Amino acid sequence: MNEFFNIIFNLFDVEHIMTAKSSKISRRPVSGVFLLNKPLGLSSNGVLQKVRWLFRAQKAGHTGALDPLATGLLPICLGEATKFSHYLLDSTKRYQTVVKLGQVTTTGDVEGKVVQSRSVPPLTRDMLELVLDGFRGDIQQVPPMYSALKRDGRPLYELARQGIEIEREARPVTIHALKLVDFDTESLTLDVTCSKGTYIRVLGEDIGEALGCGGHLTALHRVQTGHFELVPEYTLEYLEQLNETERDMLLLAPYAPVDYLPQVQIPEGRLKYFCNGQESNIDHDAVPEVLVFEGERCLGLAEITDKKRLVPKRLLNL
């Protein structure tokens, strides 16, 4: 236990040092999306600050936090790409996770204290598939106390650390896919595709309860966010080995979070109007969201109304 806390304190020092360093370097207006493979142990904000420092970016934001003990895909939006980060926050996510059966912890994962132990029933694939089928599709999920959700302005995890538990309302989430990858006498390996707002820790706990023995997560690895898939080699260590030009080549376009949307070219003579946020005419059918280009340069996001009006919604300063 002491070794665990030493690791956490050391990681905190690393994040503190990175934040201090970041205020001393010269910033630049770099824009794009980096598909970071987040390491074990660091917070999402900690790796965000390090990536921002390595790119010397003026602005940066992540697109859905991972707990320190979770690993995998954490898209980092730099500069103008932050204008589209909410599309990734709201997107479907895919995870690979391991659930240890027979033990319930305070946090729903290995960080917490074991508060209950029960025997695990004999497991068969047919039995497990029957239980898992109850968690596929639209379900109700009670958020955990150890979460960043707030009550009266205070994060629930602060209350939980004080031993306070309050009633939480169940919320609707969708489990698009739940695959049993492997299992043994006391653990399950699952592949989960889910909607935003889904807590995989709670899913693991609920599956354990449905089996009558309880459970908690021992590993959580995100492999997909929206249409972005994990690139295993895109680690912090890999970034550190590259020079600035090489790092910039790894960035996706600032509009990459929405590059699946239809695209149109700005009509001749309408560039000034669009860049000033003004509506203009366009000979195009109505589209709720469309990317507007001048040649290969993306100007931003717009709506085309049924009256054939091009209405700017989000402009890119590139």
Swiss-Prot record:
PANTHER family: PSEUDOURIDYLATE SYNTHASE TRUB1, TRNA-PSEUDOURIDINE SYNTHASE. The active site is at 67 (nucleophile). This is tRNA pseudouridine synthase B. It catalyses: uridine(55) in tRNA = pseudouridine(55) in tRNA. Keywords: Isomerase, tRNA processing. It comes from the Bacteria. The lineage of its organism: Bacteria, Pseudomonadati, Pseudomonadota, Gammaproteobacteria, Moraxellales. SUPFAM superfamilies: Pseudouridine synthase (SSF55120), PUA domain-like (SSF88697). It comes from Acinetobacter baylyi (strain ATCC 33305 / BD413 / ADP1). One of its GO terms (molecular function) is RNA binding. InterPro entries: PsdUridine_synth_cat_dom_sf, PsdUridine_synth_N, PUA-like_sf, PUA_sf, tRNA_psdUridine_synth_TruB, tRNA_sdUridine_synth_fam1_C, TruB_C. Belongs to the pseudouridine synthase TruB family. Type 1 subfamily. Responsible for synthesis of pseudouridine from uracil-55 in the psi GC loop of transfer RNAs. Pfam families: TruB-C_2, TruB_C_2, TruB_N. GO terms for biological process: mRNA pseudouridine synthesis; tRNA pseudouridine synthesis. Its EC number is 5.4.99.25.
